[in-house]
Amino acid sequence: MATVAPKGNCLVARAIPSDSHADQLTDLLCKLSVNGDANQKSVNKFESQHGVTPSDFRDIQNIRSSALAKKTKTSKFQLDGVTLFADLTPNSKSKKKTENQETKEKDEEAEEKKDGPPKDDKELKMKKEKEQEDENAELDEQKKDGDLLGRGPVHNVRVATGGSHPYHRAQIPYGCAAQTPITDISAYTGYGSGYECGSTWSLSPDTTIGSISASTTPDTVLSSDGYGSASPPQHSPKESLQSPFSDISSADTSRVLTPENNELPESLQDFILQYSNQYTKEESIRGRPPSADSGVSSPMSARSAPYASPHVPQGTCSGPTTPSFNQTRLSPRTSENGITAKQRLNAIIPESDLATGFHWACTTWKNVLTNRDADGDTPLHIVAAHNDLGKIYALCETLRKTMNENDDNVFNVSNNFGETPLYVAVLQRSIEVVEYLLELGASPNSRSSRAVGDSPLHFATARGMNNMVEALLSKREIRVNETNDDGQTSLLCAVKMHGMMDEQTQHKIDNKSIIEMLIKAGADPTIAETSTGKTIVHHAVDKMDVELLDFLKTVVNEDTFTELANLSDFHGDTAVDLLCSSTQNEDTNNVRENLYIRLLTSGAVPNKSRA
């Protein structure tokens, strides 16, 4: 069969030339590249997000907790952890209510579509008002639920709790001894919640002790780790005790975790895990180790709030420490108006004398113990002898501030005659300096080796220096019954020198008040002179002083005075014997009779030594 050629032009299909598949893949691979800068930025961004400071982390926690509170509608019904914990759990009824509300809204929208648009503006206005009323009602319901409570980190104010005390109003006083527990409480139950003394017995079974804590767990009413809550203890009568779930509605109670339903919602679990593991030692080099003093592993506890939590556990009660054997407790010697001896001395010194004194003290205090004169007097002895108040005050203050506690008291340094600066101040009759030195811890028992070996108390009592004797007797370590070289106590010196003339003031000495002060301070009236054996009654009879004898009868015990009236001296004479053996004259006969009668009425036996 012959082939017929087609009429007209003939189109022939040809394939378009293209690159090979291998070349295409190569081009695509060349376009791929690793962006190192972007990866480094993302890494830095991740580190900056996770390497936060403690303060930033706490802010993040507060923001998250506030968001959680708004989301879960955490309400503060009361300071009870059960209700607060119940608010964090899901409410099945609220879910059903939300679903029903959504279904109702869908139905209303469908009806509106069927009915078409509103006919006039009045219907639109009524519809808007109805929606506004519904929104207001929802807001009112939310307000009734209570204030939103942020669940951020809480720093409790921890205070040391006192020990068990039957009448516990406040902390046990410092140094108070432990109290014996009371087993029989029947005698204390008749006054309800209080007693006559105005305090409440915290161990009474009629009261339940609770403490409103910042913690929201129900089992943290009282802390047993040595700390108490910052809130005061709550006392409620036994009859009014209620279950911890009594104030919670049935709907709230159903949301409390039970043994059957003991799992938290997943969202809450994720939040808690993220909340607690966000900032740990492994994730950041700035992480802190757990607190060493609170017993918990949270990094935001105890020492993270230095102004609210203690650094170390505090004890509840402690007794006073025992001082070292060579230390003297320096207590200010205050007067009736509360002014110390230092203040009184400083008040009478002119400012110019103080300035001069401190300038001199700065150049003298280092060699105050070694720089002595021929009599062994130190610079303090010399200024005390001259009664230079400015230099005395300045040198004593400088020595007090530079004195080492373990060293001997520099104010008790004596010269070659055993005289201390205090003894020199007594000789100068400077009561302000004496009180000031006693306040600094100077000893009042030093004795001079001159004359008869008087102590400061002997010298003051023998010369009727009432204020000086009162200041010396106020010192605890004063030895009232110490004798001088003549064997006389301070009381014997006071009786012997009564009515005599003072060599410096040329005034008659009246020692009645000093005798009374000495006896009240513990002076023994039965001590006789070691050289003559005479007692205070012997000296009163020798002086022919009826008034003094009557005064001794009033300040001395009656039995003691009878004993003194019958005591004999080293010559074997009693007080009555002295009246009979002494030279008689008309001027003294009347006085002798009065003394004799008073001794007989006091129990004295006549002629006892010659019987």
Curated annotation (Swiss-Prot):
Residues 91-149 form a coiled coil. Acts downstream of the receptor complex composed of ilcr-1 and ilcr-2, which is a signaling complex that modulates neuronal activity and animal behavior in response to sensory neuron input. Mediates signaling of the complex. Residues 92-167, 212-255, 280-333 are annotated as: Disordered. This is ANK repeat-containing protein nipk-1. Residues 212-223, 239-255, 315-333 have a biased composition (Polar residues). The lineage of its organism: Eukaryota, Metazoa, Ecdysozoa, Nematoda, Chromadorea. The gene is nfki-1. Belongs to the iASPP family. Expressed in the nervous system. SUPFAM superfamilies: Ankyrin repeat. It comes from the Eukaryota. Residues 97-131 have a biased composition (Basic and acidic residues). ANK repeats lie at residues 375-405, 417-446, 452-482, 486-527, 532-561. Keywords: ANK repeat, Coiled coil, Repeat. One of its GO terms (biological process) is regulation of transcription by RNA polymerase II. Changing D247G: Defective aggregation behavior.
